[in-house]
Amino acid sequence: MTRALEYHYLTGQRFSEHNAEQKERETPYNAAVILLTMEREALYARIEQRIDLMMQQGLLAEVKGLLDRGYSPKLVSMQGIGYKEFVPYFNGDCTLDEAVTQLKTNTRRFAKRQLTWFRRQIEGLWIDMSRTDGAGALAQTMTYLKEQGVLQTNNNS
């Protein structure tokens, strides 16, 4: 959110317009997509831990600061997950615990939608981190990158 606002302030261009322009450019890179996933219960636990950490690191103060500087809750940028959930709290319409619970729920729902989108739209190597460790994921990745021609092998070894 802050990055998008800074970009608009510096360039006068919407961040979404910039992203659309970049998306149209042909990449000079030979790339492959590696997608990490895990069992839903483990993913949801990590989401909850991450949100708890974000709260400890000042998420509430960040949102309050934006609102205090006059950023309207109606702005698209303020409708993002992690911001919109706290507006009712600052308006006195819910408790902080209720706002955090709503943030966790919305984040879990978003993660589920992301996984669905990736499964339908993106071709690549899926690695289930619930079934392997870091070394196993690395081995799978290296094999895949070689198969895709992204990683060249030295035939002398």
Residue ranges and their predicted role:
Residues 1-31:
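Phosphate/Mg2+-binding loops and adjacent switch elements
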Residues 24-157:
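Catalytic core of IPPT-family isopentenyl/dimethylallyl transferases
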